[in-house]
């Protein structure tokens, strides 16, 4: 047990390239991603090195598609002792997804992450925030064996992700 006066911090990292973020959706089409210089691997390596230097651990939320196309990144995260958690399969908003679509996204992401070398996937963070009308997704996550969700934004922003 930790001493009462010892501080504990939680660090989570969204594993995505700069052009995956929701803020660029209107400016950069998915079809153009292959034309852009990827920075994910370089930035991930720098992050893992920084965490190792400080003996720190983090939770890395990874898209299933990244696990499929770059499984070595997931292996490096897991081998360094960090938690690998799910961000779903690919950066698309979960708002408006039916339960069947949401389940398929969860299953596809989990299969990809585990195939890439991640241990048991128990955490989830949606590519965009989960709002009040989507709280049913928390029940689905629990039924699928997830122990926590990090998708709820306590602020009422009109744009998030």
Question: Predicted regions span which residues?
Answer:
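Catalytic alpha-helical scaffold of carbohydrate-active enzymes acting on polysaccharides/glycoconjugates
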Residues: 1-123, 129-161
């Amino acid at each position: 047990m930790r001493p009462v006066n010892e501080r504990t911090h939680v660090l989570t990292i969204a594993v995505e390239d700069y052009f995956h973020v929701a803020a660029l959706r209107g400016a950069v089409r998915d079809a153009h991603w292959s034309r852009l210089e990827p920075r994910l691997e370089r930035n991930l390596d720098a992050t893992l090195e920084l965490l190792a230097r400080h003996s720190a651990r983090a939770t890395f939320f990874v898209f299933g598609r990244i696990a499929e196309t770059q499984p070595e990144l997931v292996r490096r995260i897991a081998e360094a002792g960090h938690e690998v958690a799910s961000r779903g399969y690919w950066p698309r908003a979960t708002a408006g997804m039916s339960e069947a679509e949401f389940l398929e996204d969860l299953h596809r992401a989990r299969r990809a992450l585990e195939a890439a070398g991640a241990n048991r996937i128990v955490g989830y963070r949606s590519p965009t925030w989960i709002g009040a009308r989507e709280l049913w997704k928390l029940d689905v996550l629990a039924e699928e064996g997830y122990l926590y969700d990090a998708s709820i934004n306590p602020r009422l922003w009109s744009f998030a992700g």
